[in-house]
C-alpha cells in the first residue's frame, strides 16, 4: 500500500474519531430544526468565542447558498461552571459542519419541557408532619434545623406569584424566559414554591424566594429556556454572594437529555443544591431528565401509607422518596390548592436540603448524601432496584 493511500485512510479514521455525536434521543417533544450544542471540556473561553463567530459566518453562508432569507440562528450561549454550550436553529448543512468541528463534544435536538405533576382534588394536608416524624402517626410539624434563615430559594418553573401573602414579602421576580406575562399564570410554580418556602405550608419559612419563569401558562417550555434559567440563577447568586447558600427546585421533566443533565450538575457544582423530580410515568427514572442525572438529588413520590405512589418513577437513580399526594400549598392570587405528583414531593427535599445545608455548613453536592443518611427506611414496595428511604428532617420526633 502506498504512503498516499495510508495517509488517506489515516485522515479518514481521524475525521470519524473527532466528529461529534448527534445524539439520537426520544423523538417525543423534539422542536424541528432547533439544537443544543455542547463544547468539549478542554475548550477555553477564547476558543468558545472564536467558535461562536465561526458559527455565525457558517450559518449566514449556508443560508445564502440556498437563497434562504437571513434569520438569526444562534439564540443563547452558556458558561455554567466551565460547561460551555449554545442553542439555536440551523439548517442541515450548518448542523453537519458543527458536528465536524473539532471543539464540539455533541449535538442534540432541543425538546419541550413540562411540569411533572398530576392535579388532584381533596381536603388533606400531611406532608410536613410526615417528614418531621419517624413514625407515621403524628399531625404536627417539628423542625430543629431552623427555618431557612440566610438561604435563598430559586424556583425554575411557571413563575411564582411574588405577592402571595404566604411568602410574607420575601419573594422577588427574577426573570421571565417564557412569555410576556410577568407572573405565574399556571399555578405550578407558586404551588411548589409554597412547599419549599411558604410561611404556613413551607419548610424554609424565612428564606428569600426568587422566581425564574421558563414555562408558559400551559406548563410548557423547552431545554433552551431551562438552561437559560440555570445560567441566570448561577449568575444572580454569584453577583449577590449567595453561592453555597442557595437551593433550587426542579419539578420538571423532558426525555433523557445529556445536555440537561450536564447543565444541571454544573449548576450544583457552582454552588446551588438542586432537587429534581423523578417523574410520573411509572417507569425507570433513567429515561427522563434531569431526574436521570446521578449527581443531583432525584425524588420519588410516596403516599400517606408510606408506599411508592403508583405513578412515581423508580430505579437506582432515585435517591429518596417524599410525600406527593394531596399536598396543599399556595396558588396565585392568595389562593391555596391541592396537587399530587413527584412535582409536589421534590419541594419537600429542596426545603429540608436547605435547612441541612445552612445548619451543618455542607457543600451543595454533599447535601443529598446527608439527606439519605437521615432518611427513614420505611417505603414499602419502592420498585425494582430502588431505595426504600423516606425523607426525614432530623427533628428527633
Swiss-Prot record:
Record's subcellular location: Secreted
Organism: Trichophyton verrucosum (strain HKI 0517)
Annotated EC: 3.4.21.-
Residue numbers annotated as active site: 157 (charge relay system), 188 (charge relay system), 343 (charge relay system)
Residue ranges constituting the Inhibitor I9 domain according to the UniProt record: 35-115
Assigned protein family: Belongs to the peptidase S8 family.
Classification via SUPFAM superfamilies: Protease propeptides/inhibitors (SSF54897), Subtilisin-like (SSF52743)
Domain of life: Eukaryota
Any GO BP: proteolysis
Primary role: Secreted subtilisin-like serine protease with keratinolytic activity that contributes to pathogenicity.
UniProt-recorded Gene Ontology molecular function terms: serine-type endopeptidase activity
PROSITE patterns linked: SUBTILASE (PS51892), SUBTILASE_SER (PS00138)
Residues with attached carbohydrate: 123, 136, 150, 249, 305, 334, 385, 393
Primary enzyme class: hydrolase
Signal peptide interval: 1-19
Record keyword tRNA processing present: no
Protein name: Subtilisin-like protease 12
InterPro entries in UniProt: PCSK9_ProteinaseK-like (IPR034193), Peptidase_S8/S53_dom (IPR000209), Peptidase_S8/S53_dom_sf (IPR036852), Peptidase_S8_Ser-AS (IPR023828), Peptidase_S8_subtilisin-like (IPR050131), Peptidase_S8_subtilisin-rel (IPR015500), S8pro/Inhibitor_I9 (IPR010259), S8pro/Inhibitor_I9_sf (IPR037045)
Domain (Peptidase S8): residue spans on this chain: 125-397
Annotated propeptide span(s): 20-116
Amino acid at each position: 500500500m502506498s504512503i498516499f493511500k495510508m495517509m488517506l485512510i489515516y485522515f479518514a479514521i481521524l475525521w470519524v474519531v473527532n466528529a461529534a455525536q448527534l445524539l439520537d434521543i426520544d423523538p417525543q417533544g423534539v422542536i424541528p430544526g432547533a439544537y443544543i450544542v455542547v463544547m468539549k471540556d478542554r475548550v477555553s473561553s477564547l476558543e468558545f468565542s472564536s467558535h461562536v463567530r465561526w458559527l455565525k459566518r457558517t450559518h449566514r453562508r449556508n443560508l445564502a447558498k440556498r437563497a434562504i432569507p437571513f434569520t438569526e440562528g444562534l439564540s443563547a450561549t452558556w458558561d455554567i461552571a466551565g460547561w460551555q454550550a449554545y442553542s439555536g436553529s440551523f439548517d442541515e448543512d450548518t448542523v453537519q459542519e458543527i458536528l465536524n468541528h473539532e471543539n464540539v463534544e455533541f449535538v442534540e435536538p432541543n425538546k419541550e419541557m413540562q411540569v411533572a405533576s398530576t392535579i388532584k382534588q381533596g381536603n388533606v394536608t400531611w406532608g410536613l408532619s410526615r417528614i418531621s416524624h419517624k413514625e407515621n402517626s403524628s399531625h404536627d410539624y417539628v423542625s430543629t434545623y431552623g427555618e431557612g434563615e440566610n438561604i435563598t430559594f430559586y424556583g425554575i418553573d411557571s413563575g411564582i406569584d411574588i405577592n402571595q401573602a404566604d411568602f410574607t414579602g420575601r419573594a422577588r421576580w427574577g426573570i421571565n424566559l417564557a412569555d410576556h406575562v410577568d407572573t405565574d399564570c399556571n399555578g405550578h410554580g407558586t404551588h411548589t414554591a409554597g412547599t419549599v418556602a411558604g410561611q404556613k405550608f413551607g419548610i424554609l419559612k424565612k428564606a428569600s424566594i426568587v422566581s425564574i419563569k421558563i414555562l408558559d401558562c400551559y406548563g410548557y417550555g423547552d431545554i433552551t429556556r431551562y438552561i437559560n434559567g440555570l445560567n441566570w440563577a448561577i449568575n444572580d447568586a454569584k453577583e449577590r454572594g449567595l453561592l453555597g447558600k442557595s437551593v433550587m427546585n426542579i419539578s420538571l421533566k423532558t426525555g433523557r437529555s445529556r445536555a440537561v443533565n450536564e447543565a444541571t450538575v454544573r449548576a450544583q457544582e457552582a454552588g446551588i443544591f438542586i432537587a429534581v423530580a423523578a417523574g410520573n410515568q411509572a417507569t425507570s427514572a433513567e429515561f427522563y431528565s434531569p431526574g436521570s442525572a446521578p449527581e443531583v438529588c432525584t425524588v420519588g413520590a410516596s403516599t400517606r401509607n408510606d408506599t411508592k405512589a403508583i405513578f412515581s418513577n423508580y430505579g437506582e437513580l432515585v435517591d429518596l422518596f417524599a410525600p406527593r399526594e394531596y399536598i396543599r400549598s399556595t396558588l396565585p392570587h392568595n389562593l391555596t390548592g391541592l396537587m399530587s405528583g413527584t412535582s409536589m414531593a421534590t419541594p419537600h427535599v429542596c426545603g429540608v436540603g436547605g435547612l441541612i445545608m445552612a445548619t451543618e455548613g455542607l457543600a451543595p453536592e454533599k447535601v443529598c448524601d446527608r439527606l439519605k443518611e437521615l432518611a427513614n427506611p420505611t417505603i414499602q414496595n419502592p420498585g425494582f432496584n430502588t431505595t426504600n428511604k423516606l425523607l426525614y428532617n432530623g427533628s428527633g420526633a
